[in-house]
UniProtKB/Swiss-Prot annotation:
Pfam family, one: VMA21
Intervals, Cytoplasmic compartment: 1-8, 60-77
Disulfides per UniProt: none
Sequence intervals crossing the membrane: 9-29, 39-59
UniProt keyword terms in alphabetical order: Cytoplasmic vesicle, Endoplasmic reticulum, Membrane, Transmembrane, Transmembrane helix
UniProt family annotation: Belongs to the VMA21 family.
UniProt name for this protein: Vacuolar ATPase assembly integral membrane protein VMA21
Motif (Prevents secretion from ER): 74-77
Organism name: Kluyveromyces lactis (strain ATCC 8585 / CBS 2359 / DSM 70799 / NBRC 1267 / NRRL Y-1140 / WM37) (Yeast)
Principal localisation: endoplasmic reticulum
Lumenal side, ranges: 30-38
Localization (cell): Endoplasmic reticulum membrane; Endoplasmic reticulum-Golgi intermediate compartment membrane; Cytoplasmic vesicle, COPII-coated vesicle membrane
A biological process from GO: vacuolar proton-transporting V-type ATPase complex assembly
GO cellular component: endoplasmic reticulum membrane; endoplasmic reticulum-Golgi intermediate compartment membrane; ER to Golgi transport vesicle membrane
Length: 77
């Protein structure tokens, strides 16, 4: 059974997938250039990965609530 997935959902997923890979790696290596402490670089890279994950969850909840409002509007008509 094929499921029709909106393009906006795929675009958001691809954006956050790339951000989850690229942002922590860039953070790690940028901090390695500016500090000699690997613990700080690794810790902040992990923090960046968590920030991307939190942003994705927030976007998912907002999308879910907006689709619920659209469904309620359609039911009222």
């Amino acid at each position: 059974m094929p499921v029709d997935v909106p393009r906006s959902v795929i675009a958001k997923l691809m954006f956050f997938t790339v951000a989850m890979v690229v942002l922590p790696v860039l953070t790690f290596f940028w901090l390695q250039e500016h500090t000699d402490n690997t613990l700080v670089s690794g810790g902040l890279a992990a923090a960046m990965a968590n920030l991307v994950l939190i942003a994705y969850v927030i976007m998912a909840f907002q999308e879910d609530s907006s689709s619920s409002e659209d469904d309620e509007t359609k039911k009222e008509k």
